[in-house]
Amino acid sequence: MPEGKDYGIVITEGMSEYPMADSDEGLQYAEVMMKIPRQWLENGNLLEDDEHSWVIEILCKTAYLGHIFDGAYVDEKVIIPYGEPDEAYPFDWDYEFTAVMLCRSEDIPALQTDEETKIKFYTLVPITEAERKLVEEKGSEEVKRMLSSGDMVDFEREILTEN
């Protein structure tokens, strides 16, 4: 957990082991993470926590996405629904969040491991269906700036609308 911060970071390891789709934009290698409330990590293992296990599920789904579909990759243009693509459902039934947008990491800069390999880090941020439309119009970086909690998971934050 970052010192002096009110959040913990859960990050994938191994997503960048193999390249995703060939691209001249340098999108072949990435890792994804989520900034979650500190107390979620203090309660033990996220996998054993029914209320917050979705964090691990969506990180794993995102990590595999760029490898299982031919020509696929992840970057800040990608929105990933929770559940099935045609039938997204909330992470937690008490809230409206049904997808995550990918944002460039503010915490970890891109890592050049050798001449040909540059690993980019992205933060997954939960969004609602209304916010999904905003992301499609304005982009994830603009929407992240509009969120009161930035790129941290905060189910109590104000929901953005198109107005």
Model-inferred region functions:
Residues 1-20, 27, 33-163:
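Acidic, proline/glycine-rich low-complexity IDRs
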